[in-house]
Amino acid sequence: MTFLAILFVIAVLLLLAQLPVIGFYIRAVYFGMCLIIGGFLGGLASIPFGKSPNNHFRMFKIFQAMTWPMGVRFELRNSEILHDKKPYIIIANHQSALDVLGMSFAWPVDCVVMLKSSLKYLPGFNLCAYLCDSVYINRFSKEKALKTVDTTLHEIVTKKRKVWIYPEGTRNAEPELLPFKKGAFILAKQAKIPIVPCVFSSHKFFYSHAEKRLTSGNCIIDILPEVDSSKFDSIDDLSAHCRKIMQAHREKLDAEAANLNI
């Protein structure tokens, strides 16, 4: 009887999911649950290994498997650039929570992510983030943010870590990238390491919070050649250059993605 009841609930949810707005909320809640449960299970699986950036891969495998039914597919290009063993800063455009899924396909070894401090309170996810040695930054306190930069710099130098940063600092669904925050570029200049730009094509073809739309779709992830931070006289020049090449490439990828999502 219980089994039949479960089947009935699943059938009802599948039918409701066909209605655009209701389907959006069902898929959004499902994605959120995948993030929490995937993080928790990935965290549990990582406990025997202690804190390590490479624990990310356990969570990512679980998360990718759980979200597969959603039908959002990612095509990774130029992944060989990520295989470099030396430390670098990887910067990516940030559009939505779906970026967590996208980054799982482009994640290099020995890499930590810089997260906004509020995420440390997200159940399940916070366990995995702790065991993955993630870095939390307080965007509303300059003093605390600078302290985080100093700590991260020490990790890069002593442990040869790579760091994943979203330089826009917040989600941005618009075609034009937001002005970049300086943290990633300060780190690159002070640590004397390159920056590797990572560009995601627009999610607009399958996701829109404003339109309450979340469907299956395709996203392109392209890894651009590394940028030598030592060749720029100032942090502002380095930031402006990275933003310029990422903006141009984003527009190119969006044109391709439009054809993939017809």
UniProtKB/Swiss-Prot annotation:
<keyword id="KW-0443">Lipid metabolism</keyword>
<dbReference type="InterPro" id="IPR002123">
    <property type="entry name" value="Plipid/glycerol_acylTrfase"/>
</dbReference>
<keyword id="KW-1133">Transmembrane helix</keyword>
<feature type="transmembrane region" description="Helical">
    <location>
        <begin position="3"/>
        <end position="23"/>
    </location>
</feature>
<comment type="function">
    <text>Converts lysophosphatidic acid (LPA) into phosphatidic acid by incorporating an acyl moiety at the sn-2 position of the glycerol backbone.</text>
</comment>
<keyword id="KW-0812">Transmembrane</keyword>
<comment type="pathway">
    <text>Phospholipid metabolism; CDP-diacylglycerol biosynthesis; CDP-diacylglycerol from sn-glycerol 3-phosphate: step 2/3.</text>
</comment>
<dbReference type="GO" id="GO:0006654">
    <property type="term" value="P:phosphatidic acid biosynthetic process"/>
</dbReference>
<dbReference type="GO" id="GO:0005783">
    <property type="term" value="C:endoplasmic reticulum"/>
</dbReference>
<comment type="similarity">
    <text>Belongs to the 1-acyl-sn-glycerol-3-phosphate acyltransferase family.</text>
</comment>
<feature type="short sequence motif" description="HXXXXD motif">
    <location>
        <begin position="94"/>
        <end position="99"/>
    </location>
</feature>
<protein>
    <recommendedName>
        <fullName>Putative 1-acyl-sn-glycerol-3-phosphate acyltransferase acl-1</fullName>
        <ecNumber>2.3.1.51</ecNumber>
    </recommendedName>
</protein>
<keyword id="KW-0594">Phospholipid biosynthesis</keyword>
<keyword id="KW-0472">Membrane</keyword>
<dbReference type="GO" id="GO:0003841">
    <property type="term" value="F:1-acylglycerol-3-phosphate O-acyltransferase activity"/>
</dbReference>
<keyword id="KW-1208">Phospholipid metabolism</keyword>
<dbReference type="GO" id="GO:0016020">
    <property type="term" value="C:membrane"/>
</dbReference>
<feature type="transmembrane region" description="Helical">
    <location>
        <begin position="29"/>
        <end position="49"/>
    </location>
</feature>
<keyword id="KW-0444">Lipid biosynthesis</keyword>
<dbReference type="InterPro" id="IPR004552">
    <property type="entry name" value="AGP_acyltrans"/>
</dbReference>
<keyword id="KW-0808">Transferase</keyword>
<dbReference type="Pfam" id="PF01553">
    <property type="entry name" value="Acyltransferase"/>
</dbReference>
<keyword id="KW-0012">Acyltransferase</keyword>
<dbReference type="GO" id="GO:0016024">
    <property type="term" value="P:CDP-diacylglycerol biosynthetic process"/>
</dbReference>
<feature type="transmembrane region" description="Helical">
    <location>
        <begin position="89"/>
        <end position="109"/>
    </location>
</feature>
